[in-house]
Amino acid sequence: MDNTRLNRLKEVLSVPTKTYQEENMVQYLRDVLDAMPDVEYYTDDLKNVYATKGTLNEGEYYPMFIAHTDTVHQLVDKIVVQEESLVKPDTFGHTYGDEEFLSLKGYTPNGSSTGIGGDDKCGVYLALEMLDAYDNVK
């Protein structure tokens, strides 16, 4: 993973958010989408963010990406995402030749571990990556 993508992933994972308290992630998305050329977006009353890029001819369809902006872990004011040791072998003892795996973990500023909501926030990350990669996305 190149540094630009890794930095974006760490940035998305570091946004503190929780169910019904998604304002931080919504604002993060607005800031990122404002900087993306040719992307139009709006936010509805429920804080859902809808973004599109490009135009289609009649009968064509956008690829569409959907992700959650909330997580279920305890909300903390700041999440520090750190790269930890590369994981090899996996937790079941399997090895994959010479492959190594990056581990990202979240901590509070005082060093306590915290959830990063990676299952939801990785969807946000992927949606942003698709907006960068494709001409027509919704």
What are these regions (language model features)?
Residues 60-138:
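Active-site metal-coordination/substrate-binding segment of hydrolases
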Residues 6, 10, 30, 124-132:
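Predominant activation on well-ordered alpha-helical scaffold segments within soluble catalytic domains
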Residues 17-60:
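A non-catalytic alpha/beta surface segment that caps or lines the substrate-entry region
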Residues 1-20:
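N-terminal capping segment at the start of a domain
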